[in-house]
Amino acid sequence: ARDGYPVDEKGCKLSCLINDKWCNSACHSRGGKYGYCYTGGLACYCEAVPDNVKVWTYETNTC
């Protein structure tokens, strides 16, 4: 497992400012342990998502 920003079908981060509950649900649906809105990144951040779940990386950024 690893931590990271989950991505949508376009490979973009999930935008998130203050809705931690929504982000936590999005992380759980991907098999993650916990999720919260990371203000610095303006995106949903997940902890302990399975390795097969795509997370955002600078190298593969298409947004």
Curated annotation (Swiss-Prot):
InterPro entries for this protein: LCN-type_CS_alpha_beta_dom, Scorpion_toxin-like, Scorpion_toxin-like_sf, Scorpion_toxinL, Scorpion_toxinL/defensin
Tissue/organ expression: Expressed by the venom gland.
UniProtKB keywords: Disulfide bond, Ion channel impairing toxin, Neurotoxin, Secreted, Toxin, Voltage-gated sodium channel impairing toxin
Subcellular location: Secreted
Record-level GO BP terms: defense response
Annotated Gene Ontology cellular component terms: extracellular region
Domain LCN-type CS-alpha/beta: 2-63
GO molecular function: sodium channel inhibitor activity; toxin activity
Disulfide cross-links: C12-C63, C16-C37, C23-C44, C27-C46
Main location group: secreted
SUPFAM superfamilies registered for this protein in UniProt: Scorpion toxin-like (SSF57095)
Function: First blocker of sodium channels (Nav) found in scorpions. Is lethal to crustaceans (Cambarellus montezumae), less toxic to insects (crickets) and non-toxic to mammals (mice) at the doses assayed.
Domain comment quoted from the record: Has the structural arrangement of an alpha-helix connected to antiparallel beta-sheets by disulfide bonds (CS-alpha/beta).
Family statement: Belongs to the long (4 C-C) scorpion toxin superfamily. Sodium channel inhibitor family.
Protein name per Swiss-Prot or TrEMBL: Toxin Cn11
